[in-house]
Amino acid sequence: MAQASERSAARVQVYLDCPSYLCDFDYLRTEITFVDYVRERTAADVHVLVTTQNTGSGGTAYTITLVGQRRFAGALDTLLYNASQVNSQDVTRQAFARILKLGLVRFAVHTNDADKISVSFAEPANAASPTVPTRDPWNSWVYSANANGNTNREKSQQFSSLRGSLNADRVTEAWKLNISANENYNESKFRLDDTTQFTSVRRSFGLNGLVVKSLTQHWSAGLHAGASSSTFLNQRRAYRINPAVEWDLFPYKESTRRQLRLEYGVGVRAFQYNDTTIFNKLSETLPFHALSVSYSQKQTWGSVGGGANASSYLNDPGKRNASVFFNTDLRLFKGFSLNFFTHYSNIADQIFLKKSASTTGDVLLQQQQQATSYSFGFFGGLRYSFGSLLNNVVNPRFGGSGGDNFFFSF
């Protein structure tokens, strides 16, 4: 580590690179006070990069990477913390702050504040006892259920929705299993006058399963299966099953920082329709194959992600679907960042479209999928922040913590 043999009068300057929904910045600033926090990454001595992954038990695995810059250039450390699903937000932030504090001590000992820092160790009461493997009566299975609803009503219109889901997961180093079911109900009503009213109802149901076998640090094999129904897609019943294989250019253990995954699968889809389709079908069974590639990377300069998906029916390759997407959040220079997301799909596989013409109400209320050959979307934003680089003070009065910035989106 640069200047490791000398102490500096300057405090360690730290840049926290962590989404606000993962890190409680005010809490960290009040709990870890032996460093200075800066708003600009290039002004920092230590860039703290936080990434996460979901664990098999429903918790969150944090990877905390401390990257030395300026006087600590070349220093690199990685810390891990697993937050249990049952943790409260306070328990998680306390543990996260404790681990981050330990990581920052490595740098702070090279400042004049070193004499004020102490590290303690709480010796377990039964330290002499041999370690016993933890017994898991659930055998790594995690179950969850979710139900929610909302309504919004006015004199001439009202909206209501109900959603429910069930999930069962089992994740080990060798296997990954997931079973999920969900149902959605959406209703919209519009009253034009005392005698005219439009009502739109959309229902959908899905049952999905996934089994994945770990082969190596770069290869996996899996099986997708599912059943669904959707009034929007004219599908009374839809079934699919397809085995697949996946390859990652980078070892899976690096997935919180970077991934380049390629997946290919071949399978069968079966459909039963509510109404006769544009191809005069009420039911059909078709073989298909699908290929997808996805890339993501998060570094101190920002994050990028993108991918492409393509699928077609083997009996009629002309019935196909291809899509690409790209997103980025880049810190271009001091105080200035750019973020955008875009996607495009070429669509030629809408075999489910009903033959009869849609009414004006169906179109306006989006009650049924309409024919299209493409789908495109874009969002972009710029952010510029300037002023004092130091960001140590927490002042919760009247809400918020102050600071001026300029934001523009298009």
Model-derived segments and spans:
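Transmembrane beta-strands of outer-membrane beta-barrel proteins
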Residues: Y143-A145, L177-I179, A221-A225, I241, ...
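Outer-membrane beta-barrel "beta-signal"
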Residues: F341, A371-F410
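Residues that define the transmembrane beta-barrel architecture of outer-membrane proteins
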Residues: N139-W141, Q158-L162, V201-F205, R237-I241, ...
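Outer-membrane beta-barrel translocator domains and adjoining extracellular loop/strand segments
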Residues: S156-S161, F190-T196, N234-I241, Q272-N280, ...
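Short loop/turn motifs that connect adjacent beta-strands in outer-membrane beta-barrel proteins
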Residues: P133-S140, E173-K176, S214-H218, L233, ...
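Transmembrane beta-strands of outer-membrane beta-barrel pores
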Residues: G149-R153, T172-A174, E183-K189, A225-T231, ...
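Transmembrane beta-strand segments of Gram-negative outer membrane beta-barrel proteins
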Residues: A10-V14, P133-R153, A174-I179, L260-V268
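Residues on the lipid-exposed face of transmembrane beta-strands in outer-membrane beta-barrel proteins
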Residues: A145-A147, G164-R170, G209-K213, A227, ...
